[in-house]
Amino acid sequence: MRAMVLNEPGKLVATDAAVPVRKSHEAMINVTHGGICGTDLKIYEGGIPTPYPLIMGHEMIGKVVEGSSTDDLHEGSRVIVDPVLSCGKCFFCHSGLSNLCPDGTLLGRDQNGGFGEFVAAPLTNIYPLPESVSDREAPLIQVLTTCLHAHRRANIVPGEAVVVMGLGVSGLLHLQLAKQYGADPVICVTRSEWKRELARKLGADATFESGADALLGTQERTEGRGADLVIECVGQLPVLAEAFELVRF
């Protein structure tokens, strides 16, 4: 099969690779679409330890070609793959916290992933996709679930003021989720003018450039209280410090 193989940091090549060998508890997936995220860039640059050579990619969808014959999952089923693999036996796995499994691995980081024609994945890690979700949209489900997890932890109450800082993919998804949860207002903060414009199209009640404009604007939109919740999506210390200025105490 053809695959994108990382041989060393910065050396990603399209080349022939062996088709993965499917185990009895796995399905073989013909990968049709994938996504590239910040983790992939760090792996490519060598910022995350990984074995070489490696077929990258952990955001992927495709069709089952072998290994499943249930009503929901069978040959030809269009599916999304959960790339987080766990042992299924430890305390964390039994507690619904498989992402904390000490023996957990990630497809596309610790073992070959989805930037090839085929990938083998455990049957417990593949889910049927509804036809209402397009092939172009579906790879975003993986990052959407991480955002959704954060919102469930935050427990937004309708009418609370929420600020989203940073408008990459995660930030724009957080904006839309906050609106769905009933936050009002939802304020978006970024240095990028075109991202502020996009945020307004996606439902932001107000957008501001980071810095003094964001602080003044947030105070004005919350009657001087500050935001009930700030979602920081940049991951840099100066932005985190600014988040503490925007949130109420």
Tell what function each PLM region has.
Residues P20-G34, E45-F91, P130-S132:
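Glycine-rich beta-strand-centered segment in the early N-terminal region that forms part
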Residues V133-A212, L216:
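Mid-domain Rossmann-like dinucleotide-binding core that forms the NAD(H)/NADP(H) cofactor-binding site
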Residues C87-M165:
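NAD(P)H dinucleotide-binding glycine-rich loop of Rossmann-like/cofactor-binding domains
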Residues A154, E197-F249:
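Glycine-rich cofactor phosphate-binding loops and adjacent beta1-alpha1 units
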Residues V79, V162, G226-V230:
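Receiver (REC) domain switch-region micro-motif
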Residues P53, D82, F118, P139, ...:
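Glycine- and other small-residue-rich loops at beta-strand/loop junctions that grip anionic moieties
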